[in-house]
């Protein structure tokens, strides 16, 4: 009997143990059973029961938990596409956003490697091209262009297709010497409508006479609001922008100490200038609307990679409306104690000269495309564009003069000295033929048929020959141009300069050969110019009386440029050379040789920082430096002075990290090695060495 009780007792213990284990789930996801989870204390007093859920309820609960998790999609530049008006002229083309750091440190419009400029000292001051670079426009021209590099024009606006809002902040700092800040924002309101804005600020105290002199500060503001609408059928497009420009730059007449690099200076910011409170101001605004509609069959061509399409129309009609006003002001608040001006006609110690120009343009065009239905690549395509442009201009010029009011007191009032209104009618035609994707011929013809500038023309022809990626491509081009003399050369009235002249139209004929090989990273271009009735400003020997002059002889000019990039492992060397030769070197006043080279080492630091460390060097040979006419806004041929020329070196480090690009550079790092400073314009010393910092942030949200 005791043995039977022993077995019955053992069986009861086993049954109780089984019940205890049944209350502890063996699911590894249960708190405490998964060693990877944090232990959670159980409330033994909790008597609540868990309600059983159906399969649909369990899926809903899982969906809620997934929605609460953080979105794992990383927005980047892949969600942004960009284009501009030029790329939309023939078809709808979109390109990825450029987020690289190539040429990032060359932010200034004065120091672009392939378009160097001379200036009065620093960014924001009056400038012109160092190399010969003729204008290829016809029609009315006010003749004032020394601040063109800082203007924001309708053709400078980019248009976007943004799947997410895109914002870019851009900041450059060289201390009080130079600061630039830019903001760009764009987003799609819906898949077909994009809006955005640009806002640019530039300020500079410069390097000389900047000690607590507000009038000597550069202060530039550019603002634009833009939009791009594309219909659902992709037939209708609308480009629009509103632009505002306000540029202010000092007109110092140069510093008093002409030999500052020989005698030195204790503090350059306190060096006296001839006109400490005189400046010029350009202000203007404009509206630009361009509409085009595709008629008939629409083709599409896939880009490389097949991620996006080019929309190719067979017929297109376009209309452009442009309206802008611009006012050029010269404000003199100083007595001319150091004879900056050759003369005065209305007031000896102050000037309020201004020129106001209003421009209204209506442009109509029709395009016809003839191509085969197979558009894997363009073959045997003929394109014809015809158009008509109406330009209406109204200008007025004012000075300030002292008059007697009704009470017999002397007062200074603005006085209108001239004004006119007129229109030009321009006929346009463009013919293009593409035998294949490697052979193409383009002809572009513009002729002003009626109006003030009737007779102006620009005829241009190009032949493009492609030989594949390894062989490269060749472009032959020739153009002929005749343009009416600008207003500043023929009919100008201001306090210090008055011109009433008649000149012939300036004519330019040019032919060029351009060989481009992307595989070899080679770009060779040879250009020949024949210039007749060349217009420029000059002064009497030893004088400062700048006035317009027309050369009676033809000018021959040869310009050869070569660009080449080399790479060896992580070392890279980019070089650009220009050789210019003319039979009127003292008239054109440009250097015979120019070179820009960049040597840098590519690195990938800490496995996250793509960076370049290198040096840029600019050099040009000696040339007769032009002078600058304060109050006229023109560079002119003054004393035949040549300044010694030495290389100018800049050391830089630039990098990119996720959505941020930045650089640190030491500009003019070799100052004092060859010379204590340099000139590009007579009597206007250029920048000193300066540590600069720049950063660009991109946001995609």
Region spans (language model):
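Generic early N-terminus positional signal peaking at residue ~5-7
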Residues: 6-7, 27-28, 559, 574
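Generic recognition of well-ordered alpha-helical segments
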Residues: 10-11, 127, 598, 694
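Bacterial N-terminal signal peptides that target proteins for export
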Residues: 1-9
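Bacterial N-terminal signal peptides
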Residues: 9-17
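Membrane-proximal, glycine/serine-rich, low-complexity loop/turn segments characteristic
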Residues: 23-284, 295-311, 464-471, 684-686, ...
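N-terminal low-complexity tails
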Residues: 341-346
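Sec/Tat signal peptide C-region and signal peptidase I cleavage site
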Residues: 18-22
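Exposed, low-structure sequence patches enriched in small/polar residues
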Residues: 162-164, 186, 241, 277, ...
């Amino acid at each position: 009997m005791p043995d039977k009780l022993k077995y019955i007792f053992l069986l009861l213990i086993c049954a109780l143990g089984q019940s205890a284990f049944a209350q502890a789930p063996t699911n590894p996801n249960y708190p405490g059973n998964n060693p990877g989870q944090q232990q959670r204390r159980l409330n033994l007093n909790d008597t609540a029961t868990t309600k059983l859920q159906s399969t649909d309820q369990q899926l809903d609960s899982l969906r809620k938990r997934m929605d609460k998790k953080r979105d794992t999609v990383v927005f980047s530049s892949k969600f942004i596409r960009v284009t501009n008006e030029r790329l939309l002229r023939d078809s709808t083309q979109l390109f990825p956003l450029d987020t690289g750091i190539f040429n990032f440190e060359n932010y200034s419009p004065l120091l672009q490697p392939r378009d160097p400029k001379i200036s009065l000292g620093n960014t924001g001051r009056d400038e012109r091209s160092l190399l010969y670079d003729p204008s290829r426009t016809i029609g009315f021209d006010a003749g004032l262009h020394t601040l063109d590099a800082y203007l924001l024009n309708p053709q400078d606006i980019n248009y976007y297709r943004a799947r997410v809002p895109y914002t870019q902040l851009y900041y450059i700092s060289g201390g009080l010497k130079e600061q630039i800040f830019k903001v760009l924002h764009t987003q799609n309101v819906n898949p077909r409508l994009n809006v955005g804005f640009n806002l640019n600020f530039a300020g500079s105290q410069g390097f000389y006479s900047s000690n607590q002199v507000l009038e000597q500060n550069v202060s530039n503001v550019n603002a634009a609001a833009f939009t791009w609408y594309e219909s659902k059928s992709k037939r209708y497009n609308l480009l629009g922008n509103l632009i505002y420009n306000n540029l202010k730059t000092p007109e110092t007449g140069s510093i008093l100490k002409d030999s500052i690099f020989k005698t030195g200076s204790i503090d350059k910011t306190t060096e006296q200038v001839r006109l400490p409170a005189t400046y010029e101001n350009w202000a203007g605004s404009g509206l630009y609307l361009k509409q085009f509609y595709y008629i008939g069959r629409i083709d599409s061509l896939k880009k490389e990679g097949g991620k996006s399409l080019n929309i190719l129309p067979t017929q297109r009609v376009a209309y452009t409306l442009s309206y802008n006003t611009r006012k050029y002001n010269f404000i003199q608040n100083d007595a001319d104690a150091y004879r900056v001006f050759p003369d005065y006609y209305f007031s000896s110690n102050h000037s309020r000269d201004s020129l106001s120009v209003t421009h209204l343009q209506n442009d109509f065009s029709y395009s016809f495309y003839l191509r085969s239905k197979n558009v894997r690549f363009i073959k045997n395509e003929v394109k014809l564009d015809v158009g008509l442009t109406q330009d209406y201009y109204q200008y007025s010029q004012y000075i300030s003069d002292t008059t007697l009011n009704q009470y017999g007191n002397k007062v200074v009032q603005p006085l209108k000295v001239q004004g006119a209104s007129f229109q030009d009618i321009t006929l346009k035609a463009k013919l293009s033929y593409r035998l294949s994707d490697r052979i193409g011929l383009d002809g572009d013809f513009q002729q002003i048929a009626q109006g003030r500038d009737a007779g102006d023309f620009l005829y241009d022809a190009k032949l493009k020959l492609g030989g594949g990626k390894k062989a490269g491509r060749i472009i032959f081009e020739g153009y002929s141009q005749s343009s009416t003399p600008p207003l500043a050369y023929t009919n100008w009235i201001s306090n210090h300069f008055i011109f009433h002249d008649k000149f012939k139209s300036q004519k330019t004929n040019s032919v060029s050969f351009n060989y481009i090989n992307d595989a070899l990273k080679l770009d060779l271009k040879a250009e020949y110019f024949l210039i007749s009735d060349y217009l420029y400003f000059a002064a009497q020997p030893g004088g400062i009386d700048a006035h317009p002059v027309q050369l009676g002889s033809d000018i021959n000019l040869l310009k050869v440029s070569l660009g080449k990039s080399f790479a060896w492992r992580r070392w890279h060397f980019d070089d650009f050379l220009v050789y210019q030769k003319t039979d009127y070197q003292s008239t054109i006043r440009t250097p015979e040789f120019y070179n820009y080279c960049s040597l840098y080492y590519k690195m990938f630091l800490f496995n996250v920082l793509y960076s370049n460390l290198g040096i840029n060097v600019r050099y040009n040979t000696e040339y007769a430096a032009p002078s600058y006419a304060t109050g006229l806004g023109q560079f002119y041929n003054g004393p035949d002075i040549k300044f010694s020329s030495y290389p100018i070196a800049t050391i830089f480090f630039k990098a990119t990290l996720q959505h941020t690009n930045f650089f640190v550079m030491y500009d003019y790092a070799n100052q004092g090695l060859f010379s204590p400073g340099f000139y590009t314009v007579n009597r206007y010393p250029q920048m000193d060495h300066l540590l600069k910092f720049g950063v660009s942030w991109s946001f995609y949200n």
